[in-house]
């Protein structure tokens, strides 16, 4: 995980986020982060920047973010009052590649890997299509459900930072 992706519901106040799922487990056990350590973070469909680990409470952690403008929370939190706009750690995500991947639907085992790899490489548009050799049963796989696709794309995004 090269980028910790934060969601709207992770924010507890202006520039503080609290996470207690697989991301916090990864930060504590893989990164072996301690209080005061800096981590790369990004808001889904928003800015990329850094966060400082401020609190560890079991499997729950709190991060203080420095992400800049472009943070549009769906809550009543005012994020513009404590944001350092001139921070060297704040940046826009890379410009999307002008690329569309058109691919015949692969075996269900390969769907996860393809989605993760495409997200890691920055591919924004993926089109699965039917072809002569595609088994009709492949279209019934649960891996093509929206939440499963989203999960694999997020895993790839965490690696590629794009």
Language-model-derived ranges and their functions:
Residues 1-91:
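N-terminal positively charged helical leader segments and presequences
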Residues 92-162:
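RNA substrate-binding interface of SAM-dependent RNA methyltransferases
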């Amino acid at each position: 995980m090269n980028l910790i992706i934060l969601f709207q519901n992770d924010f507890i106040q202006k520039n503080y986020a609290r996470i207690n799922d697989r991301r916090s487990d990864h930060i504590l056990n893989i990164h072996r982060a301690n209080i005061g350590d800096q981590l790369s973070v990004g808001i889904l469909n928003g800015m990329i920047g850094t966060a400082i680990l401020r609190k560890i409470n079991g499997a729950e952690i709190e991060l203080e973010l420095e992400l800049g403008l472009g943070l549009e929370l769906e809550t009543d939190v005012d994020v513009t009052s404590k944001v350092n706009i001139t921070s060297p750690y704040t940046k826009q995500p890379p410009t999307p590649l002008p690329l569309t991947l058109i691919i015949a639907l692969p075996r269900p085992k390969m769907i996860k890997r393809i989605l993760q790899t495409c997200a890691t490489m920055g591919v924004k548009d993926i089109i699965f299509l039917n072809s002569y050799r595609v088994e009709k049963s492949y279209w019934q796989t649960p891996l093509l459900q929206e939440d499963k696709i989203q999960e694999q794309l997020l895993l790839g995004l965490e690696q590629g930072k794009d």
